[in-house]
Amino acid sequence: MRETSHGARDNVDVRLRRVGATSHTEREGTHDQGPKMTRVIAGAAGGRRLAVPPGTGTRPTSDRAREGLFSTWQSLLGGPLDGERVLDLYAGSGAVGLEALSRGASHTLLVEADARAARIVRENVRNLGLPGAEVRAGKAEQVIRTAPPAEPYDLVFLDPPYAVTDDDLREILLTLRSEGWLAEEALVTVERSTRGGEFRWPDGFEAIRSRRYGEGTFWYGRAASTCEDAR
């Protein structure tokens, strides 16, 4: 999982594909309000700015929450990111996936259903110039059913709009596992509204911990290994 170096890829791989259209960006009632910005916190692109899709629908993960996410990942991995493959579903501005590349991931797939938001993710990738990014425009549940990835993912982050139910997310997690998207013991993080109560993991996943950041809570889990399934 860690043998690929962060600098091993030569080109920024930005593939914008259309597979359908609900997303981290909720389009109803949104309108242009001028550019909003966030930033990469640390790593090779630390301090660089990222554009955020205009309007009120996108909920960028705050710096504090994002720092907490990567601190927890580092603790669970036993060290900094080093060549992991990262899947960022409901990518919004792409801040989490691009933060992962900046901190040492070898590849990030950023999936976003809203076409305008996906274009901004692509612009952020190009502006940062970090290798190893791939962008797909489409609904998460459709993208993960189109074809299995060339290689499975070690870290997965899901921050869907509030309209996506816990049952919807459990179905997506089961599909990720059955369709070969998850590496052995992949770490999976789900962000949900704090007011929604406890997130229950589906069969095949082990709950690890949770962390609250204001109105959102991160739920950390791990895909069970095939050895555990066989028991």
What would you call each of these model-derived segments?
Residues 2-231:
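Class I S-adenosyl-L-methionine-dependent methyltransferase catalytic core
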